[in-house]
A protein has these predicted regions:
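Bacterial Sec-dependent N-terminal signal peptides
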Residues: 1-29
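Sec-dependent signal peptide cleavage junction
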Residues: 22-42
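Active-site SXXK
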Residues: 42, 56, 62, 79-105, ...
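A short, well-structured edge-of-sheet supersecondary motif
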Residues: 43-74, 104, 205-207, 294, ...
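Active-site helix/loop module of the DD-peptidase/beta-lactamase fold
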Residues: 75, 80-84, 96-135, 139, ...
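Active-site Gly/Thr loop motif
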Residues: 207-226, 230-233, 264-327
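Short, gly/Ser/Thr-rich active-site loops of penicillin-recognizing serine hydrolases
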Residues: 273-275, 299, 337-367
Length: 367
């Protein structure tokens, strides 16, 4: 049964504290928007059986303006979020870079000398922007990368042949991020889950968000690129921090420079194939489609990202829209069988949400 409410400011703050996620204190003024168009869209997905349930939070300028759940979902529902975890992974590594223990331009072989081929010359920023030249996943017939440690994962990546020279081509995948995570582990002297908890999860109150244990059932590996699981409020706290340029509840989590680097064009001159994600969901082609762990869906005239996201194949979709000063998180997990039968793509459907928010915002401002 659908649960729908646009919460008043005090109630929202109390609820978020109760589940362990803390937001910047909401602005005192009340904001009322008609989100019925979004409600109808998501409810139709659930009614069609594509999702058993879903949750959605939308915030504007640090104030929650929509908080709703559908089907059997509650704010505490924890699911694997697939590639939505890439944003979390990049932020964790950014925290290690902030400490000076690692550089975005460090080559792989500086930390992992066993990479003696061209893969060893790829830089940390190339690993996190899918321009390293690494294969996207393990080859057909090989063991899927559902290893429980990055050390073990890297052992099975080192001997794979490179697809291209570093910097030559954008190729979205997961293996390169495993190597990036291992570099961060070595630089910080800690395992990945401990790093994530210390640098990102605990400071943000993300008590139900983890990268381990890695799912061995299929569809949610490798660890950094697809293995995170989270909840509605946990991930929204992360978005609040990114929206506020690295600060959360008055605490500095990431440097402002780190958030800028993550959002900057990291594809540069690498070739981008036609019909890549951004072109498909926004019907426009530009080369600067990716930063570090996040998509740059829309750019302004100066080339700055104004709509950033990290969509997961199963439907989870976090975004920040600078044109409306809003951010949101849609959490769900697709029923693969029913979606495939209907030709429904969870990956390409969720990105309609920020567009619907814009329509609502523009309509309200005209009245």
């Amino acid at each position: 049964m659908k649960q729908l409410s646009t919460m008043k400011n005090l109630l929202i703050a109390m609820l978020l504290w109760s589940v362990g996620a803390c937001f910047v204190k909401p602005m005192p003024r009340q904001m009322a928007y008609d989100f019925s168009s979004i409600d109808r869209e998501i409810q139709a997905w659930v009614d069609s059986g594509y999702y058993d349930g879903a949750g959605l939070v939308i915030a504007r300028e640090n104030q929650i303006i929509l908080d709703t759940c559908y089907g059997n979902y509650t704010p505490e529902t924890q699911v694997y979020i697939a590639s939505a975890g890439k944003w979390l992974a990049a932020a964790t590594i950014a925290a290690v870079v902030d400490e000076g223990n690692l550089s975005w331009d460090d080559p792989v072989n500086q930390w992992l000398p066993e990479f003696t081929d061209v893969k060893g010359t790829a830089t940390l920023r190339q690993l996190l922007s899918h321009t390293s030249g690494y294969p996207d996943y393990q080859p057909e017939g090989a063991h899927r990368d559902d290893y429980q440690t990055l050390k073990e994962s890297v052992l099975h990546i080192v001997n794979l042949p490179a697809d291209t020279m570093p910097g030559a081509k954008f190729h979205n995948g997961g293996l390169a991020m495993q190597v990036a995570g291992r570099m961060a582990e070595l630089a910080a002297g800690k395992d990945w889950e401990s790093l994530f908890q210390e640098k990102i999860a605990q400071p943000l109150g993300m008590v139900d968000t983890h990268f381990t244990p890695v799912d061995s059932g299929g569809g949610h590996s490798p660890m950094l690129g697809g293995g995170a699981r989270s909840t509605l409020y946990d991930y929204t706290a992360f978005l609040n921090m990114i929206f506020n340029k690295g600060t959360f509840e008055g605490k500095r989590i990431l440097s402002e420079k780190a958030t800028e680097e993550m959002q900057a064009d990291q594809v540069k001159q690498a070739a981008v194939a036609k019909h890549e994600y951004v072109e498909r969901v926004r019907a426009e082609m530009h080369n600067g489609i990716y930063g570090l762990g996040e998509w740059r869906e829309e750019l302004d005239f100066a080339g700055n990202a104004v709509l950033i996201s990290s969509p997961g194949w199963a439907g989870a979709y976090p975004w920040i829209d600078k044109t409306t000063n809003t951010y949101g998180f849609f959490i769900t997990h697709v029923n693969v069988e029913k979606a495939n039968q209907a030709g429904f793509s969870s990956f390409y459907s969720s990105p309609v949400l920020p567009m619907l928010v814009r329509e609502v915002y523009q309509t309200e401002n005209k009245e």
